[in-house]
Amino acid sequence: VLSAADKGHVKAIWGKVGGHAGEYAAEGLERTFHSFPTTKTYFPHFDLSHGSAQIQAHGKKIADALGQAVEHIDDLPGTLSKLSDLHAHKLRVDPVNFKLLSHCLLVTFAAHLGDAFTPEVHASLDKFLAAVSTVLTSKYR
């Protein structure tokens, strides 16, 4: 459960991410593909080379979804319901992949945000991404 402090940290750091959200999410996705090669199996039609237009476009989709989640942090299930349906029923993404992507997103944010990425922000953002992952996998059951 996200505390009021967690929500404040997430909103504040997302504000610092700002216009770089799509870029950072694409970088996190690319890190995921390199660090956990089995995740590539869900993207057989993608050009997975560094900086490809497809990775950039999917990074923007991830960033947009996370931005909506931040904006509606008190209603993650309602906000992410359609994405949950898509990933569970149509794409059938293995739930573990959300944890892998979340980890790579945290690494990417840490690399870019420097001193703003405090231990408290790290913990809150980790909890937030875990909450998002839980919602995205909720329709699997």
From Swiss-Prot:
UniProt-listed PROSITE patterns: GLOBIN
Residues involved in heme b binding: H87
Positions where N6-acetyllysine occurs in the chain: K16
Domain of life (superkingdom): Eukaryota
N6-succinyllysine PTM positions: K7, K11, K16, K40
GO molecular-function term, one example from the UniProt record: peroxidase activity
Residues at which O2 binds: H58
Expression sites (tissue/organ): Red blood cells.
InterPro entries on file: Globin (IPR000971), Globin-like_sf (IPR009050), Globin/Proto (IPR012292), Hemoglobin_a-typ (IPR002338), Hemoglobin_oxygen_transport (IPR050056), Hemoglobin_pi (IPR002339)
In-chain residues carrying the UniProt-annotated modification Phosphotyrosine: Y24
Phosphothreonine PTM sites in chain numbering: T108, T134, T137
One Pfam family cited in the UniProt record for this chain: Globin
CC terms in the record's Gene Ontology section: blood microparticle; haptoglobin-hemoglobin complex; hemoglobin complex
Subunit structure: Heterotetramer of two alpha chains and two beta chains.
Function: Involved in oxygen transport from the lung to the various peripheral tissues.
Protein name in UniProt: Hemoglobin subunit alpha
Gene source species: Macropus giganteus (Eastern gray kangaroo)
Lineage, opening ranks: Eukaryota, Metazoa, Chordata, Craniata, Vertebrata
This protein's encoding gene: HBA
